[in-house]
């Protein structure tokens, strides 16, 4: 069964095939089911980009979308996530997309349910589809991963994006650096080396900024965020020192003038909105992988 839970479960060849399918969709290839197929989106945390991106992807593939509201469901009555998924499975749902605040919520589910789970983010753990859309964006820009230098900057400890990207990009041959306030370092993430931000600015090919996750911190004050921007954010002055041809990425939502100066969000180097566009194509590709009997399957030459 084609769950997509973490990047570590994907081989280089599988990553390549997903990216090639996504690239085909980006280039206008169509793939629609001719039979009624239900897919459920279960979001237990707030989301704009991931939720709507999945919904657009599902509808482009001709799937029937069930949008689950936790507040209006039997979860409020104490129903377990397992029972919720089994209920959806019993009434004919063929796959579930889940975002959940619990790290690795899927560990006890993956061998108990009979439909694919697509992880749309688990707590501070993993975010595989965000990683895949980031990989697609980098691939489109540079044509390769091998030899690239990539800085992942900010709240590394609480970031599922940092965890997924560092692991996958290392597997694909890139060199990963982290820049972070001391209290937000993740010593368990062994896929990169910590260096001061100002040393990395002129060296790296990709500046991947992370959102300051104020919902996971006790203190979120304007003066603290101003200090963060000056010490750890991509200021206009830092952007001027970036190497020629390098790009800026951010998983969004963006805290303007915190992680990045507002005027840089749509600057020439920025690929932030391109990432969002690519999110639809990548999610079409992972849905296609999860539902091969409905949407068919394609094999490709290695794309990495």
Curated annotation (Swiss-Prot):
Superkingdom as given in the UniProt entry: Bacteria
Locate the residues binding L-aspartate.
77, 160, 211
Against HAMAP family, the record matches this protein to: Asp_carb_tr
Q: Name one Pfam family in it.
A: OTCace
Instruction: State how it assembles.
Output: Heterododecamer (2C3:3R2) of six catalytic PyrB chains organized as two trimers (C3), and six regulatory PyrI chains organized as three dimers (R2).
Any coiled-coil ranges, and where?
none
| Key words, A-Z | Pyrimidine biosynthesis, Transferase
Any idea which positions bind carbamoyl phosphate? 49-50, 99, 127, 130, 252-253
Q: Which family does it belong to?
A: Belongs to the aspartate/ornithine carbamoyltransferase superfamily. ATCase family.
Q: Which gene encodes it?
A: pyrB
Q: In which pathway does it act?
A: Pyrimidine metabolism; UMP biosynthesis via de novo pathway; (S)-dihydroorotate from bicarbonate: step 2/3
Q: Which GO terms describe its molecular function?
A: amino acid binding; aspartate carbamoyltransferase activity
The UniProt function text for this chain reads: Catalyzes the condensation of carbamoyl phosphate and aspartate to form carbamoyl aspartate and inorganic phosphate, the committed step in the de novo pyrimidine nucleotide biosynthesis pathway.
Q: Does the keyword Transferase apply?
A: yes
Among its keywords, does the record have Ribonucleoprotein?
no
Q: Which reaction does it catalyse?
A: carbamoyl phosphate + L-aspartate = N-carbamoyl-L-aspartate + phosphate + H(+)
Question: Which BP terms does GO give this entry?
Answer: 'de novo' pyrimidine nucleobase biosynthetic process; 'de novo' UMP biosynthetic process; amino acid metabolic process
Instruction: Give the EC number(s) listed in the UniProt record.
Output: 2.1.3.2
Name of the molecule in the record: Aspartate carbamoyltransferase catalytic subunit
GO cellular component terms listed in the entry, alphabetical order: cytosol
